[in-house]
Design a protein with these regions (language model features):
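Glycine/small-residue-rich loop that forms an oxyanion/phosphate-binding "nest" at active or ligand-binding sites
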Residues: 62, 68-98
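A residue-level signal for conserved active-site and pocket-lining positions in enzyme catalytic cores
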Residues: 35, 95, 154
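Structural motif
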Residues: 30, 50-52, 72-74, 92-95, ...
């Protein structure tokens, strides 16, 4: 397992840019996922994530240690994990994942939800989660909406 201890590490700097910048996420086509359950859901729908990152203290967590068993992971110092600022209390597991491309066309035979101008990532995430729970299979985000693959939307 490779360990990252320094804020000057180029990989950490890239993580920080992904965490803070929508422009960086669009440029790289990647986002950050926080937590075992979100990573599991992503992998079930889209395949393996690009990189798994675990906080030093999270190596002792039963759930996380079982999840990473046999997988290549990077170990990030706990203070660096907190520095990313994705959540107040990090879960201990992050993943760098490719953002799936949106479907080119709307399937008119399926339910859809249209969001327009909803800027708050927490609100976008809550609406998308509620719509998914109600069986809505498509979401269209209009101009001015928070990005669907923003870490804050995914966490909501």
């Amino acid at each position: 397992m490779k360990r990252i201890q320094s804020r000057d590490n180029p990989f950490f700097k890239g993580l920080k840019r992904l965490a803070e910048s929508g422009r960086e996420r669009r440029k790289t086509g990647q986002t950050l996922l926080d937590g075992v359950h979100l990573v599991e859901a992503y992998e079930a729908a889209h395949g393996a994530v690009d990189t798994l990152i675990v906080g030093e203290s999270a190596l002792a967590s039963g759930e996380i240690s079982r999840f990473i068993e046999g997988r290549e992971v990077l170990v990030l110092a706990d203070n660096l994990l907190r520095d990313l600022g994705l959540v107040d209390t990090p879960s201990g597991l992050l993943a760098v994942a490719a953002m799936p491309q949106a479907a080119a066309a709307v399937d008119l035979d399926k339910d859809a939800i249209l969001l327009d101008g909803i800027q708050d990532p927490g609100n976008v995430g809550a609406i998308l989660r509620t719509a998914a729970a109600a069986g809505v299979g498509q979401a269209l985000l209009g101009p001015g909406c928070a990005a669907a693959w923003s870490p804050k939307v995914l966490r909501a």
